[in-house]
C-alpha cells in the first residue's frame, strides 16, 4: 500500500473537519496539532478517542453521546471487555488506562477508550496532574498498536463531566500532546485534531496558547491557515 505524504494527510483532514471550526494550528516535527471547536461525532479520523468511565458503560456526558452515535455494537463490545477483565478481578478500564475497540458507527477505523481523572472525587482530584499524564500515556501506547493511525481525533481528556479545571487542563493538554508530536520518535500520526464543544475550555485554551506560544514545541501556523496557505 502506498504511504500517504504529510501533505496528502493535511488535504484529507480538510475534508474531515467541515463540521468544526479550526481555532489553532501548530506544526510539530511529525505533523500538525489542531484545536477545533465543534462536534467530535462529526469529525472523521483514523483513530477516535472516547473519554470513558471505569465501567466502560457510556452513561454520562460525551462518553454517553459518542457511544449512542456508535450504536449497540459498541456497547456490546465494551460489555464483553468488562466481562473478561472482571474474570481477573480487574476494572473494565481503570483511571489512567485505555482499551481499544472498532469504531462501529463513528467516523473512524478504531476507538481508544481512555479514563481520565474524575475531579469530582477528592482522592483523584488531589493527584489529578499525575493521573492526567498517565491517561495520555495510556492513550499514546494504545495508538501505537493501531493501523491506520495517521489522523487522531480526540476530546481534551477530563474536561467534560469529570470537571478538571479548564485553565490547568488546557495547558496540560498542550504540554503533553505537542511534545509527543515533536519528540525524536515518530508516533506514526500526521495530524492530531483536539475537538471541544466547551466554550469555557476553548477560551482558556486560546489564553494559554497566546501566553505561551513561544515556549511550546513546534511552530504556530494558525495565521497561515487563516490566510488560506494550506487546508
Predicted region positions:
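Macrodomain-like recognition of ADP-ribose-binding/processing modules
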Residues: 1-231
Amino acid at each position: 500500500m502506498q504511504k500517504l505524504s504529510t501533505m496528502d494527510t493535511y488535504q484529507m483532514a480538510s475534508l474531515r473537519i467541515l463540521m468544526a471550526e479550526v481555532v489553532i494550528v501548530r506544526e510539530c516535527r511529525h505533523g500538525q496539532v489542531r484545536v477545533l471547536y465543534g462536534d467530535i461525532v462529526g469529525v472523521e479520523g483514523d483513530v477516535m478517542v472516547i473519554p470513558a468511565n471505569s465501567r466502560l458503560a457510556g452513561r454520562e456526558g460525551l462518553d454517553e453521546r459518542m457511544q449512542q452515535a456508535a450504536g449497540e455494537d459498541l456497547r456490546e463490545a465494551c460489555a464483553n471487555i468488562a466481562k473478561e477483565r472482571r474474570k481477573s478481578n480487574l476494572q473494565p478500564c481503570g483511571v489512567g488506562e485505555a482499551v481499544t475497540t472498532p469504531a462501529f458507527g463513528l467516523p473512524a477505523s478504531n476507538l481508544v477508550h481512555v479514563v481520565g481523572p474524575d475531579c469530582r472525587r477528592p482522592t483523584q482530584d488531589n493527584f489529578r496532574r499525575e493521573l492526567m499524564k498517565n491517561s495520555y500515556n495510556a492513550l499514546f501506547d494504545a495508538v501505537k498498536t493501531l493501523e491506520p493511525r495517521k489522523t487522531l481525533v480526540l476530546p481534551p481528556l477530563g474536561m467534560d463531566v469529570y470537571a478538571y479545571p479548564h485553565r490547568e487542563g488546557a495547558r496540560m493538554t498542550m504540554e503533553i500532546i505537542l511534545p509527543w508530536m515533536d519528540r525524536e520518535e515518530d508516533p506514526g500520526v500526521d495530524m492530531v485534531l483536539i475537538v471541544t464543544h466547551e466554550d469555557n475550555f476553548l477560551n482558556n485554551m486560546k489564553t494559554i496558547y497566546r501566553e505561551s506560544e513561544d515556549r511550546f514545541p513546534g511552530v504556530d501556523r494558525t495565521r497561515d491557515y487563516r490566510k488560506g496557505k494550506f487546508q
